[in-house]
């Protein structure tokens, strides 16, 4: 335990909280990146599926794993994508989502409900 004199000289250290989405930094709601690998992975224990994910290289940070939401996609290696924060609960290490309908990733085909989340324009 520190003495009063030590506390006067040094003070106590503030505990810094861990960032949930470190690749986005403080001021960026989204970042652009390039896909290095597009693949499927299986979720954690009670669930079963083939979830579509991509490794994305972000300049000035490194590589992160991002989830591709919706049914079907046109992503390949070297596709340019926009990522946002938001984890996938049953995929360990996946803390980002790729935004549909932005840059190289098309919106979901034949989507009628919740269109804004999947980058689909209003059909007339």
UniProtKB/Swiss-Prot annotation:
Transmembrane segments: none
Family from the record: Belongs to the universal ribosomal protein uS12 family.
A single MF term (Gene Ontology): tRNA binding
Keyword tRNA-binding: yes
Gene Ontology biological process terms from the UniProt entry: translation
Any Pfam family: Ribosom_S12_S23
Domain of life assignment: Bacteria
Assembly behavior: Part of the 30S ribosomal subunit. Contacts proteins S8 and S17. May interact with IF1 in the 30S initiation complex.
Gene Ontology cellular-component terms listed: small ribosomal subunit
Keywords: Methylation, Ribonucleoprotein, Ribosomal protein, RNA-binding, rRNA-binding, tRNA-binding
SUPFAM superfamilies, A to Z: Nucleic acid-binding proteins
PANTHER family: 30S RIBOSOMAL PROTEIN S12 FAMILY MEMBER (PTHR11652)
UniProt keyword tRNA-binding, yes or no: yes
Gene: rpsL
Name the UniProt record assigns to this protein: Small ribosomal subunit protein uS12
Summary of the function given for this chain in its UniProt record: With S4 and S5 plays an important role in translational accuracy.
InterPro entries documented for this protein: NA-bd_OB-fold, Ribosomal_uS12, Ribosomal_uS12_bac
Positions carrying 3-methylthioaspartic acid: 90
């Amino acid at each position: 335990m520190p003495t009063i004199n030590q506390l006067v000289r040094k003070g106590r250290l503030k505990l810094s909280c861990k960032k949930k989405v470190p690749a986005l930094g403080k001021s960026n709601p989204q970042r652009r990146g390039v896909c290095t690998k597009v693949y499927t992975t299986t979720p954690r224990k009670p669930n079963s599926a083939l979830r579509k994910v991509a490794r994305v290289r972000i300049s000035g940070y490194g590589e992160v794993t991002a989830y591709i939401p919706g049914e079907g996609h046109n992503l390949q290696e070297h596709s340019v994508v926009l990522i946002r924060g938001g984890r996938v609960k049953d995929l360990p290490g996946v803390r980002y989502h790729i935004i549909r309908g932005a840059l190289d990733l098309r919106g979901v085909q034949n989507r009628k409900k919740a269109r804004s989340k999947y980058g689909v324009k209003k059909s007339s």
